[in-house]
Amino acid sequence: MRILFTILKDLGYPVSQEVQDYYSKIQFWNDWWKGYVQEFHKYQIKNESGNSREVKRKQMRMAKKICEDWADLLLNDKTRILVECNEHGTDITQEFLTGDKEDQNGGVLGNSKFWKLGNKAVEREFAQGTVCFYLQLVKPTVNKGQLSAQSVQIKAIKDAQKIVPLTYDEEDISEIALASEYTQNGERFMYIQVFKQEQEGYQIYNHYFKINNVAGDAVGYERVSAPNGEAISYKLPCKPFVILKPNIENNIADVPLGMSIYANAIDMLESCDLAYDNLFMDTLLGKKKIFMDQALLSMKPTAYALNDKGEKVPVKQEPDVGATLEKSLYVSTGTQVSPDKPRLFEEYNPSLRVDENKENVQFNLNLLSSKCGLGQNRYQFSIQNMTTATQVRASNKELTESVWKQRIAIQDALTELTRSIIILGKEKCHISGLDPDVRITIQFDDTMFSDEEAERLRMLQEISAGILQKWEYRVRYYGEDEETAREMTGETENPADRIQSRFFPQEGTQIEEGPEGEA
């Protein structure tokens, strides 16, 4: 990070010390996401000889699991972006964005593999606090000073340490620098894009640098030309980037970057790993042991070594318990196993404390899950636990409320990004019929909050009560169109037409009589 800050300062974009210091916290959160924090997971123990050796604490890696779950809840391939304007404009704009309205595997989003990219980006957002989506022109050309392109592509910077805010206020980051590194012919390079706001749009500056190792840890750099002849700068008519941050207030530092969803739950992450490590150690140390009299063990031949004075001294002898059995199974007790009972061996089977360890792990999982906004019962340390969507909805109100809260930020970002895509499509790709003023709707995946079995049963009950018709059931759950569904159920007449003909007949039409001659 130091080299990035140095380059930005030399380019005329100094970064405040407070913002620079914040990146150490991002690195700490990223270590937890990876599952290994050296100062916590590495420790030392002493063996029977009094010598210390380094060991590694066992990990549940719950930080990554939490971020994966948040990403699946907020942005996945069942999320849909829909636009609505005049009929012709809607079709053209929707096709440019997503290819079609249902699958949405085409257009700008499909060509950018956005649903896969977006899901991974949201996972990193909740781990590190910040990610950035930005727009890039596909096959740009300049003709008579005018920039045009074939299409638009969505890219992402998922490493928060490569996102540097330049101009910002309490609500938004308006100017930013994005960095990425690449290696060519064994040499290290850095590419920096600077997005500067102007009166009408944004000016984008591209900078390329070769990173040189000077001496020791010192790093230098030199400016190089663009590898593929990219433009040094160009202008776009809209804001070509959006910043995603978890929708929680930053209580760690007054900076424009976001904070990890588990930033205030580090103690809980440590407790989970401690509990799991204790379970592992109890299992490891709970093996059967046989304490044996020395007379039952064959000894290796006496070995000698020279001391500092050149004298031969015997080396400590170890019991030869055989290569096929684990050494820790047998423990030599010298000449007597027990002072009270003269015997040659004694078996010892320690308790594994399975129930206590499971309860300890579950308790810490509940604390962690609740602290990260997923509700207390999100994770069950048991393979025998199954919960229906109705039970989730009823027992985990905290999760439901947290999801709605986080979707606000996702919806705002996707709406802004979508509108910028449409503007670039119209202004730079020259696609006629695109309407930047469309109404944009983000449809999120709500399957986790719905219980299809219960909904089917309720719909059947409403059909029996006469509230709904049978064809409506086939349309919803069999995917048939209305005409086919009516034909399959024999309900070919539209109820509205039946009411019209019965109670409001046209002139010359006889009113249908009831069973007792009443109209």
What positions do the PLM features span?
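Extended, helix-rich architectural segments
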Residues: M1-I173, P515-A519
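Charge-rich, acidic-biased intrinsically disordered regions
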Residues: V19, K144-S151, S298-L325, T387, ...
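C-terminal amphipathic alpha-helical
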Residues: F114-G129, Y134, M281, R353-S450
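Extended, regular secondary-structure scaffolds
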Residues: A127, C132-I261
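Extended, charged amphipathic alpha-helical segments
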Residues: E230-A394, E398, T447
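Short acidic alpha-helix initiation/capping motifs at coil-to-helix transition points
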Residues: E356-V361, S450-A454, E462-Q469
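Activation/maturation switch segments at domain boundaries
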Residues: R458-A519
